[in-house]
């Protein structure tokens, strides 16, 4: 029984590894055009994640294929991965000091079966400077990330606070993925808390057994 991650993202690989499940990587490699402004962002993320999983499942019959898609939404506008320095600069200026939503959908495919779920995290950006933005662009940070930033970036430190799942903003909610695998009947156990990042132990999506043990230790 093989679990396949349909993503080339090193961040998603690292997050999935936290669950302690052996997996292989087989990226879907599809075009991801952003729909019109009035499209429903949750539906977009779910449809793209499902499509990625379906593409890879078609060439891997019998395997379990996991895919994800992340969209960043600011006042109804979907922000993709910037394609130029100018676009990255404009995105980061737009988000600076403001709240926005990050939606990540996770899809699992095996044969003709599909399981899809998503979660939303609200993110408040800090008041970084124009010089901070320029330095981030010079390092090449924005160009492979929806919205042009990484919440975990130690240099830009773009985020002041968030509400919801932290790993969802990184690109794959660990607990949403864990729950989806369980619902589909894939054999997965609760991760060893010693290997869980602190943000995952305190995540609002974490199972009660994890959050209660964390609270007791405190």
Swiss-Prot record:
- The main location is cytoplasm
Q: What class of enzyme is it?
A: hydrolase
Q: Which CDD domains match?
A: Maf (cd00555)
What does the UniProt keyword field contain?
A: Cytoplasm, Hydrolase, Nucleotide metabolism
Name the site position(s) for Important for substrate specificity: 11, 70, 152
Obligatory cofactor(s) = a divalent metal cation
Name a biological process GO annotation. nucleotide metabolic process
- Compartments, record wording: Cytoplasm
Q: Which GO terms describe its cellular component?
A: cytoplasm
The keyword Acyltransferase is assigned to this record: no
UniProt EC number: 3.6.1.9
List, from the UniProt record, the residues annotated as the active site of this protein. 69 (proton acceptor)
The lineage's top-level taxon is Bacteria
According to its UniProt record, which reaction does this protein catalyse?
dTTP + H2O = dTMP + diphosphate + H(+); UTP + H2O = UMP + diphosphate + H(+)
Show the GO MF annotations. dTTP diphosphatase activity; UTP diphosphatase activity
Quote the PANTHER family the UniProt record gives.
BIFUNCTIONAL DTTP/UTP PYROPHOSPHATASE/METHYLTRANSFERASE PROTEIN-RELATED, BIFUNCTIONAL DTTP_UTP PYROPHOSPHATASE_METHYLTRANSFERASE PROTEIN-RELATED
Q: What functional role does this protein have?
A: Nucleoside triphosphate pyrophosphatase that hydrolyzes dTTP and UTP. May have a dual role in cell division arrest and in preventing the incorporation of modified nucleotides into cellular nucleic acids.
Q: What does the sequence similarity comment in the record state about its family?
A: Belongs to the Maf family. YhdE subfamily.
Q: Which HAMAP family match?
A: Maf
The protein depicted here goes by the name: dTTP/UTP pyrophosphatase
UniProt organism field: Thermomicrobium roseum (strain ATCC 27502 / DSM 5159 / P-2)
């Amino acid at each position: 029984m093989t679990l396949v991650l349909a993503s080339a993202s090193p961040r998603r690989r690292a997050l999935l590894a936290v669950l302690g499940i052996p997996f292989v990587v087989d990226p879907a490699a599809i075009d991801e055009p952003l729909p019109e402004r009035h499209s429903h962002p949750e539906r977009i993320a779910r449809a793209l994640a499902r499509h990625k999983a379906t593409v890879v499942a078609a060439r891997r019959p019998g395997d379990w294929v996991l895919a994800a898609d992340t969209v960043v939404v600011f006042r109804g506008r979907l922000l993709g991965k910037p394609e130029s320095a100018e676009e990255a600069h404009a995105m980061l200026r737009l988000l600076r000091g403001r709240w926005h939503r990050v939606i990540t959908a996770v899809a699992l495919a095996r044969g003709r079966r599909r399981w899809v779920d998503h979660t939303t995290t609200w993110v408040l950006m800090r008041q970084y400077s124009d010089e901070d933005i320029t330095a981030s662009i010079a390092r090449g940070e924005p160009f492979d990330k929806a919205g042009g930033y990484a919440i975990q970036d130690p240099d830009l430190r773009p985020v002041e606070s968030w509400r919801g799942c932290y790993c969802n903003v990184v690109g794959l909610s660990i607990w949403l993925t864990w729950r989806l695998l369980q619902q589909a009947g894939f054999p997965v156990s609760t991760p060893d808390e010693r290997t869980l990042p602190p943000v995952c132990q305190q995540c609002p999506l974490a199972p009660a057994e994890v959050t209660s043990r964390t609270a007791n230790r405190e």
